Amino acid sequence: MGIIVQKFGGTSVGSIERIQHVANRVIEEVQKGNDVVVVVSAMGKTTDELVNLAKQISNHPSKREMDMLLSTGEQVSIALLAMSLHEKGYKAVSLTGWQAGITTEEMHGNARIMNIDTTRIRRCLDEGAIVIVAGFQGVTETGEITTLGRGGSDTTAVALAAALKAEKCDIYTDVTGVFTTDPRYVKTARKIKEISYDEMLELANLGAGVLHPRAVEFAKNYEVPLEVRSSMENERGTMVKEEVSMEQHLIVRGIAFEDQVTRVTVVGIEKYLQSVATIFTALANRGINVDIIIQNATNSETASVSFSIRTEDLPETLQVLQALEGADVHYESGLAKVSIVGSGMISNPGVAARVFEVLADQGIEIKMVSISEIKISTVIDEKYMVSAVEELHEAFGLAEEAAAVRS
């Protein structure tokens, strides 16, 4: 057979009982004749607990020392999983990110993987061992330990699958797959059997938390087939791959949404490109992520620009904008972003009109809109967020089309 990479998140290894369950899932794959590489996150809330410990020492801890501290969380879970497999009669070896040959750039807290030397992993596999790798971490060329930021364990797993030329990468989570929308809010949400990399990447970027965007981007670039599955259920999950053979007739594949959005409008900025660039360069330098951007001319000499941000970034955004001479800044909080995604929109005109019609019928005002080939995002009042998602979910027939699949 081939190499299979499995990734288990913090919830999946959150207790000794769950680690024992994960060991059994790993053994099931080994018994199929596959070589197995397992990537695990820190147990449960371990990372949060480590962050809190650091805050008790310092309000502004060194990023280098934070990486040293946070990287210990995964070391606990990989060692315990290896011990569990030993007790069940299987040869297993745990490796930290740097022992596994994962080299990253020189950026503490949010490093990107630059290279993976798979020599040691392959040697362990050749010796008949199950290899368990700590997610979320690596080492620079100068020997400094780094962490990969949010979603880092997903990225570790996909990067290893690419480097090892694995048959596929299974991402085990606390949900059974990728749904048409969040089933906690929309009861008619259904699981999607297959979805393309591009569609999954859009959903991930829009806040669908099942997969991190960086991991999906890695999978797309290296054509790594992904399956999102539940660690607690034997139910088949959602395949993420290049070619989607089913449901091609579906115009919309999923709906993502997020609350705590604020619209910021800057009026009276000088009407030339450098002026606008100065605003967004300053925001980027402060680590503020700007989403939808709309620019309008107010007169022959000045213009206004509106953009959306996370509400938590508002205080820092206002600090940046206060430095602009002659500009008048307004903002509106209590907003939400609702987005529909689907490759079928490329060849089906009128999707945006249908979205506007559905929202208008519910008396929902659209405050901002952004449209791309496979995505339409709208910013609306937060109080209408769930009802808007429900109405769009029904209008595009998502509840009837994407049925769950059991193995």
UniProtKB/Swiss-Prot annotation:
Species in which this protein is naturally found: Geobacillus stearothermophilus (Bacillus stearothermophilus)
What does this protein do, in the record's words?
Catalyzes the phosphorylation of the beta-carboxyl group of aspartic acid with ATP to yield 4-phospho-L-aspartate, which is involved in the branched biosynthetic pathway leading to the biosynthesis of amino acids threonine, isoleucine and methionine.
Tell me where in this chain the ACT domain is found: 264-338, 340-407
Quote the EC number: 2.7.2.4
Query: Which residues are noted in the entry as ATP-binding?
Result: 7-10, 41, 173-174, 179-184
Q: Which named protein is this?
A: Aspartokinase
Q: How does it assemble?
A: Tetramer consisting of 2 isoforms Alpha (catalytic and regulation) and of a homodimer of 2 isoforms Beta (regulation).
Q: Does the keyword Cell cycle apply?
A: no
Q: Which InterPro entries match?
A: AceGlu_kinase-like_sf, ACT-like_dom_sf, ACT_Aspartokinase, ACT_dom, AKii-LysC-BS, Asp/Glu/Uridylate_kinase, Asp_kin_monofn, Asp_kinase
Reaction equation(s) it catalyzes = L-aspartate + ATP = 4-phospho-L-aspartate + ADP
